[in-house]
Amino acid sequence: MEAQRIQGTYQGLSLNKWWCWDSKSEWLYKCSAQKLVVVISNIESSEVLERWQFDIEGDKTAKDDSAARGKSQKTVQDEIRSVIRQITATVTFLPLLEVSCSFDLLIYTDKDLVVHEKWEESGPQFIISSEEVCLRSFTTTIHKVNSMMAYKTPVND
């Protein structure tokens, strides 16, 4: 697995940073992406403050089957909504980000995958001294997605 990344900033984010969404959709459909990570960092120090990780287990045979894989679209959407509600609820315990931040989008792909030149290889960008929170999982007809997030433990003065 290789991590491919593209960068953006919170302030003045241009939607053209997402030029490659078609690539990501294709990678997900072909089960070529195993992990999607959003890393939030302090712009000035480059210190990683939050890391949102979504591990993706793809079933390459599922998309070739003509029969549906036992889950209705409503069930899948309900599971995804549940994860989104849980992500939204993290504001109750996450430290407030009081610095200007940027984000990196990392996608761990098959090593032999050809990627656009705007993507570059990256390290995992782990957080030193972090707290980790496991979030709910969900499954679709092709994927199982496990999610977790880590955040920088506040330093007591």
Q: Which residues are covered by each model-predicted region?
A:
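Long protein-protein interaction modules used by eukaryotic assembly/scaffold proteins
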Residues: M1-D157
